[in-house]
């Protein structure tokens, strides 16, 4: 699994950025930390509909029931958003993912105000897809 910051650290790092250009660069840097997605996982079953860019997300439980997320995108900023989402869900079980509303976290970053409408819709599609994957594992 990629080395992603805990949500509190991510929020602190985000707040330390001086402007939105730095924040976007930080998001892109987070995306670069994601492990490469195997080609066999880049298939229609793992493709997230509702995203303007191509986004693939795979959710698998480990031996302890913790959901391990894998993902990629053909767009750097979207790949970074995947990493932000994954940092919020890392270490959680399927039940915890289904019950967790991460939208307040994104609101606290004011991220939706600075994303294009299509990226905001794509972010929402990613959140729905991860929760649906988790719910299917219950």
UniProtKB/Swiss-Prot annotation:
<protein>
    <recommendedName>
        <fullName>Cysteine desulfuration protein SufE</fullName>
    </recommendedName>
</protein>
<dbReference type="GO" id="GO:0016226">
    <property type="term" value="P:iron-sulfur cluster assembly"/>
</dbReference>
<feature type="active site" description="Cysteine persulfide intermediate">
    <location>
        <position position="51"/>
    </location>
</feature>
<comment type="subunit">
    <text>Homodimer. Interacts with SufS.</text>
</comment>
<comment type="function">
    <text>Participates in cysteine desulfuration mediated by SufS. Cysteine desulfuration mobilizes sulfur from L-cysteine to yield L-alanine and constitutes an essential step in sulfur metabolism for biosynthesis of a variety of sulfur-containing biomolecules. Functions as a sulfur acceptor for SufS, by mediating the direct transfer of the sulfur atom from the S-sulfanylcysteine of SufS, an intermediate product of cysteine desulfuration process.</text>
</comment>
<dbReference type="GO" id="GO:0005737">
    <property type="term" value="C:cytoplasm"/>
</dbReference>
<dbReference type="InterPro" id="IPR023939">
    <property type="entry name" value="Cysteine_desulfuration_SufE"/>
</dbReference>
<dbReference type="InterPro" id="IPR003808">
    <property type="entry name" value="Fe-S_metab-assoc_dom"/>
</dbReference>
<comment type="pathway">
    <text>Cofactor biosynthesis; iron-sulfur cluster biosynthesis.</text>
</comment>
<dbReference type="GO" id="GO:0006790">
    <property type="term" value="P:sulfur compound metabolic process"/>
</dbReference>
<comment type="similarity">
    <text>Belongs to the SufE family.</text>
</comment>
<dbReference type="Pfam" id="PF02657">
    <property type="entry name" value="SufE"/>
</dbReference>
<keyword id="KW-0963">Cytoplasm</keyword>
């Amino acid at each position: 699994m990629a080395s992603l910051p805990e949500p509190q650290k991510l929020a602190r790092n985000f707040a330390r950025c001086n402007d939105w250009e730095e924040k976007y660069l930080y998001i892109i840097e987070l995306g670069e930390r994601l492990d490469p997605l195997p080609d066999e996982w880049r298939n229609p079953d793992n493709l997230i509909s509702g995203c303007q860019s191509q986004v693939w997300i795979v959710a698998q439980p480990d031996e302890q029931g913790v959901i391990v997320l894998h993902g990629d995108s053909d767009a750097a900023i979207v790949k970074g958003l995947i990493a932000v989402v994954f940092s919020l869900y890392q270490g959680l079980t399927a039940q915890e993912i289904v019950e967790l509303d991460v939208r307040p976290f994104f609101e606290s970053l004011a991220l939706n105000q600075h994303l294009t409408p299509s990226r905001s819709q794509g972010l929402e599609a990613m959140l729905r897809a991860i929760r649906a994957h988790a719910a299917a594992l219950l």
